[in-house]
Amino acid sequence: MIMKYFCTVMIAIALVGCTATPPPTQKAQQSKVSPTRTLDMEALCKAQAAQRYNTGAQKIAVTGFEQFQGSYEMRGNTFRKESFVCSFDADGQFLHLSMR
């Protein structure tokens, strides 16, 4: 008798567990930076790199732009093939220039 009720309860628990819907997966929100803001960031990066490498901004090439969770990075190089990375915060404010 106890076995009959035990089996019935176990089957009911198994069925209830199978019918529960999984919670929706959360996706990270990606904020889009405006094209004008990107151009401002590029100009600032070129100006900072030109000052650091003692050259003109027209001799600086920005080759890449990456967006991370809370920041942006712009990669580039000089006409002498010296690499650098400009870092910006989530609002697009310049943080620092790293020479590579």
Curated annotation (Swiss-Prot):
Pfam families: YsaB (PF13983). It is a lipid-anchor. PROSITE patterns: PROKAR_LIPOPROTEIN. InterPro entries: YsaB-like. It comes from the Bacteria. One of its GO terms (cellular component) is plasma membrane. It is found in: Cell membrane. Residues 1-17 form the signal peptide. A lipid is attached at residue 18 (N-palmitoyl cysteine). Keywords: Cell membrane, Lipoprotein, Membrane, Palmitate, Signal. A lipid is attached at residue 18 (S-diacylglycerol cysteine). This is Uncharacterized lipoprotein YsaB. The lineage of its organism: Bacteria, Pseudomonadati, Pseudomonadota, Gammaproteobacteria, Enterobacterales. The gene is ysaB.
